[in-house]
Amino acid sequence: MSDVLFPDLPGLEWDLSKKPIFNTKIMESVNGRELRASYQAVPKYEISLSFGFLRESKGKNELQQLESFFLERRGAFHSFLFKMPDDCDYTCSYSGDGSTTSFQLYKQMHTSVIPLAHTKAETVFEVDPTFWNENDNQQFWSDNDDDLFWDDTTAQVTKSGMVTLSKPLKQGHKFEVKGTYYYRCRFADDEQQYTNFMSKLWKANKVEMIGSLGNKV
């Protein structure tokens, strides 16, 4: 398992597909009633993509990048990180409780919330919490003379899907974090086909992966 990124190549076509998969054991009795057991809380994904062109001329070595990446992973053996187009950005909102400094980043999909295990690390940045407290009864000022009028809290996003604050936010104060997440993937098979359709031009009609937003696949 490594954190190397799948190559970002311009020949990637729009017909990328993903299929969420769960693991459910279903036992059926003679009268037709079923007993079901779920062995997987977070789905894995079957991901399929294709490259309409892979150039091998004028300083471009796109075929070599893709093929060598596959070889270095030993086919389906080693995993890697994949930034899926149009499915890689998160926006997370949190409320302070006066004590918590670490928060789990997540992907919001309509009513579903999926924890993220692989995110782009961000160095220290300033948190900009909402100015008004969600508690209407909270007084505007502080009785503590050492409290600043502005908030000087900073935050850092780790590569493991956590955001850490330099100090706890006050009860009810909210803040928002935006960034990039990755899928943990492996190749679906131990083989991959490339087609030479013109001089110095290749294509890969199908590159298939098994992926997850969790830490392992």
Set out the residue ranges of the language-model regions.
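Solvent-exposed edge beta-strands and adjacent loop segments
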Residues: 1-70, 183-202
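Beta-strand-rich interaction surfaces with strong enrichment in secreted/lumenal proteins
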Residues: 36-37, 92-93, 165-167
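Surface-exposed coil/turn segments at beta-strand junctions on protein surfaces, enriched
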Residues: 40-42, 98, 158, 168-170, ...
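A generic structural signal for beta-strand entry/edge sites
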Residues: 44-46, 100-102, 160-162
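Short, hydrophobic/aromatic-enriched beta-strand segments in well-ordered soluble domains
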Residues: 51, 173-181
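Secondary-structure transition/turn motif
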Residues: 52-53, 106-110, 165-171, 212-213
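Extended beta-strand solenoid/passenger and fiber regions
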Residues: 64-153, 179-217
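A surface-exposed beta-strand-loop module
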Residues: 150-173
